[in-house]
Amino acid sequence: MKIKTILTPVTCALLISFSAHAANADNYKNVINRTGAPQYMKDYDYDDHQRFNPFFDLGAWHGHLLPDGPNTMGGFPGVALLTEEYINFMASNFDRLTVWQDGKKVDFTLEAYSIPGALVQKLTAKDVQVEMTLRFATPRTSLLETKITSNKPLDLVWDGELLEKLEAKEGKPLSDKTIAGEYPDYQRKISATRDGLKVTFGKVRATWDLLTSGESEYQVHKSLPVQTEINGNRFTSKAHINGSTTLYTTYSHLLTAQEVSKEQMQIRDILARPAFYLTASQQRWEEYLKKGLTNPDATPEQTRVAVKAIETLNGNWRSPGGAVKFNTVTPSVTGRWFSGNQTWPWDTWKQAFAMAHFNPDIAKENIRAVFSWQIQPGDSVRPQDVGFVPDLIAWNHSPERGGDGGNWNERNTKPSLAAWSVMEVYNVTQDKAWLAEMYPKLVAYHDWWLRNRDHNGNGVPEYGATRDKAHNTESGEMLFTVKKGNKEETQSGLNNYARVVEKGQYDSLEIPAQVAASWESGRDDAAVFGFIDKEQLDKYVANGGKRSDWTVKFAENRSQDGTLLGYSLLQESVDQASYMYSDNHYLAEMATILGKPEEAKRYRQLAQQLADYINTCMFDPTTQFYYDVRIEDKPLANGCAGKPIVERGKGPEGWSPLFNGAATQANADAVVKVMLDPKEFNTFVPLGTAALTNPAFGADIYWRGRVWVDQFWFGLKGMERYGYRDDALKLADTFFRHAKGLTADGPIQENYNPLTGAQQGAPNFSWSAAHLYMLYNDFFRKQ
């Protein structure tokens, strides 16, 4: 039965009024604190991330801050430069304006604030007013409008100085090193140009800190003539005006000679018609807010969180650069290891799902970026991995692909939620061509999982690791390191590994393939993959457990001709099985839309087989929860690969069958009961990454305690799917009230302490922002 929704004139008027209010960026001042004046190139917080929150937009490779007081007013401090794969500050303040009247410096009062899409300063004195608005005009250039109101002539002075000091944590120097001393080839140089100045940078290839081409420049262009004096790493520019004037300045960070050449025409056009570019930016942001803020039931505080999420995701958008030929979205522009254009699939699926609702073009581009490096037949590096999607792509290729990058990673992929994300983009845009474009890529990805990660061939893929120099010898023997006391020895081969495990003469084992398998899950040190601290393991053994309960086993996956394809953990993961269920479900839906009924039928059959297996084999009736299962030498009588790994405790993988819709109602009822139990997951901030009863639980442990917003949202969607929406709404309200910093002006961070609500991890974090936006859409309501 179809239900018609009839909107009365009053309802329509309220919705139109809400939409108009929501789209007004001026209603959302200072949602994120963008003030600051960096004193160091690496001005880190307690966790080694840059501690300020510069404004980035339009995929730009540089960002600006607001002044933090009188000393920095008139400029937009920073500048934050993205040096291919890292964020580094260039200056404490660069191009700071001071105004002089009759030979005296004008004493202004300052009002500075951010709105979505702009930074604004208002400088006020008795006879002079200055209003400065900074927006982004292109993916490489920001535009500053400076409106000066005065009845008298004025002298304008701009100044700036490049940073000298290298590094600090929470404002305290980590050393007395200078930038020039640490990077002698950086060779920063300020030069005057016809209408401004530029900073040129020498070539530095410091793999883990600073990457420049030797061709990069930071350019400043002004719409009025200036006289510039340069003294080493300092400059002063001067101009005279006879009264009220509006002037324009462009700032461009250009990373290659080709970019330097290409952007000059853009800069000339921007200065020729600045109002066009400013209006385009304003209208673009009004459109983001109009599309994105569609929940009239949310409180004003919850709506501000949604705006913070939109600002965060758009700020982490990067335009094409280096090996990444598409726009993309990174985990965190200020994150130590998450900046530049570093792109992960797992983050992408979630980012794109959210951004489809307010920035669908970039949602598509982000997914395209990931699949642009999907392994094709005849690949020169890993021909055995056709369909594989690398874990991390970035500006620079790995040495194996002819680059000098250290971040590019093909050791693993990420869980198969790609089709879920692609389908959400379609649901929002109704773009059938989008499905036609992505469908064959998704099929190849799906087939790779079954070919390269299904050791026992039962259609239930495992997490694992690729064939890679980090995992195996040249001859294909798996590497591992045995540690005992202060001695360690690297060995190779599965037979040797089995003997070492059986003898037990070790304190710990380090297995690169195990690390990669946990990365492949998206949950880096989760208990289910055998990760547990020594103290926790000692306690577990003292309470009657066995150390071997936490020892993982591996299998080689080989093609029919014996070629080593990679490795699988000898356990089938319930979350990956559930994601694969969804993958089949969405592929069937796409195949139907694209007129491929036979393919749709096959994927529906595969989905049903997975659902049957998940409920038969992965649910433990004693503890009433879903778990991974061990792969034994022979299948059990019921067709299962083995028994659930109950001893490693409960984690969010247990509600993955609910989120993906694979659970039976009876099993879902049981799981929800566990989720709502205060002795398990219903903590101060609920639904952490390990239950309180898990032997490996730690409130501050990355994936064995902390609350990640994606797993939280997965849990709520699973509850809703099986009839527990009211309970989900209560948990959402608890999260909103207890997760610290959400409604303040701090950045969105990676995760939260389940017992205290304290924020943890990288700031300005995309997938947290994505899922906070989804929470706003789905669950945030006035209570």
Give residue spans per PLM region.
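Structural helix-adjacent loops and short alpha-helical linkers that scaffold large soluble proteins
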Residues: 294-303, 355-368, 425-440, 591-609, ...
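Alpha-helical support elements that line or immediately flank enzyme active sites
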Residues: 341-378, 654-664, 712-725
